């Protein structure tokens, strides 16, 4: 709630800057450099917020699990950019061996291309969430209509093919702009980024990827790995093959439980219902 309030106040402040700058320019034409500078600074702030995946300035954003889930020592393992038929089946087998659940942020186009694999993810007890339809690298440059098309097409594809309706959205590379928040509200989606990531699309050293994920690891963390676009190790294997089992062993050693984001959401809702009014 505090983060949502901060987002609303920031939007009001941004609008006020524009109105004040315009009024000042009309009333005092010689003040136009100050007005232009204020507007430019405001837009620079908006751009910086969009380039910071964990920012909450542009709207509500899960960077950690809710308090109730954190108190239960839950951790969310999220896996992006699939499904990939060359990688995802083995990832599912690793999760099965450890009795772990994960959240797969899937690209809608890949869900359409690999329908049975997407259904298999859900059948094995994991959740599939929305990662846009085409994962365009320029997602943060899209206008509201194009952004809604990306989100909506993925939402429809995932729900139609798997029978599971996503509750969460993660922007491609985590980058976004102010148009995204109203789009997500329209589709009743919660933005989710991460607490820590392994940079496993560019780092082939499994030990280094693992260290990035477990350094400071605590209940409530949201961790990011990739089954799609995964870096390969010296043997040509996706780095997630080595990182994921070691990560799950580390979670068990620290008495942390991997859960889906949807399970964490339910846990938070149940805790709210139990709390005295």
PLM regions: where:
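C-terminal domain-boundary segment and adjacent tail
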Residues: 49-70, 234-277
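Active-site beta->alpha N-cap acidic-glycine motif
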Residues: 50-139, 150-153, 157
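A short acidic, helix-capping loop that chelates divalent metal ions and anchors anionic groups
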Residues: 135-142, 230-234
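Charged helix-capping and loop-helix junction motifs
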Residues: 146-151, 206-211, 237-244
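N-terminal membrane-anchoring alpha-helices
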Residues: 1-64
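His/Asp/Glu-enriched short active-site or ligand-binding loop at hydrolase and phosphoryl-transfer sites
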Residues: 175, 180-217, 256-267
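A cross-domain feature marking catalytic cores of carbohydrate-active enzymes
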Residues: 79-81, 106-108, 130-132, 170-173, ...
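Acidic-and-aromatic substrate-binding clefts and catalytic sites of carbohydrate-active enzymes
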Residues: 82-86, 106-114, 137-145, 170-178, ...
